Amino acid sequence: MIISENNRREICKYLFKEGVCFAKKDFNLPKHPLIDVPNLQVIKLMQSFKSKEYVRETFAWMHYYWFLTNEGIEFLRTYLNLPSDVVPATLKKSAKPGGRPFGGPPGDRQRGPPRSDGDRPRFGDRDGYRGGPRGGDEKGGAPADFQPSFQGGGGRPGFGRGAGGYSAAAPSGSGFP
């Protein structure tokens, strides 16, 4: 596609300044939202840059996203005649706010929510977590005379690897009755 030199330069300036570019996948959009050129020209120029590995492309939710690579930075520096100390915004270090560092002196601030002395136990209402009475009483469970029995052979055939399936007898010599 033939793209005018002015439009090509505008797209390249924006891409180098930000380090990233996006475009909605709408080939009939008359103008890109951030650059004063047709959206189709942005998409086609970025496709060309992608084939030359100047940008890396991601597509999500009907939008293209292009990220400038190191080769692309070098190419755009020469194309736009920029000095080597000028870098895209994605490579600039962000200024950290001058706040307190993590940690600090231990008695400097109160940790956790404010507490009043002795109004609740240390672990809250978790005392009864395991349930049941806390004495040496008889524990709940099966009675002492409980004899569990499992149906084998009689009744219904086993399930899965249970009793051989389809009420078949155990193979002879297997050691099973």
UniProtKB/Swiss-Prot annotation:
Q: Where in the cell is it found?
A: Cytoplasm
Q: Where is the composition biased (Gly residues)?
A: 151-165
For this protein, the record's Pfam families field holds:
S10_plectin
Q: Which UniProt keywords apply?
A: Cytoplasm, Ribonucleoprotein, Ribosomal protein
Question: Where does the protein principally reside?
Answer: cytoplasm
InterPro entries referenced in this protein's UniProt entry, alphabetically: Plectin_eS10_N, Ribosomal_eS10, WH-like_DNA-bd_sf
| Biased composition, class Low complexity, residue ranges | 141-150, 166-177
Q: Which GO terms describe its cellular component?
A: cytosol; cytosolic ribosome; cytosolic small ribosomal subunit
Q: What are the boundaries of the region Disordered?
A: 90-177
Question: Entry's Gene3D superfamilies?
Answer: Winged helix-like DNA-binding domain superfamily/Winged helix DNA-binding domain
User: In this entry, which stretches build a coiled coil?
Assistant: none
Top-level lineage group: Eukaryota
Residue ranges, compositional bias (Basic and acidic residues)? 108-140
Give GO terms: molecular function aspect only: mRNA binding; structural constituent of ribosome
PANTHER family in the record, alphabetically?
Answer: 40S RIBOSOMAL PROTEIN S10, SMALL RIBOSOMAL SUBUNIT PROTEIN ES10Z
Q: Which family, according to UniProt?
A: Belongs to the eukaryotic ribosomal protein eS10 family.
This chain's protein is named Small ribosomal subunit protein eS10z
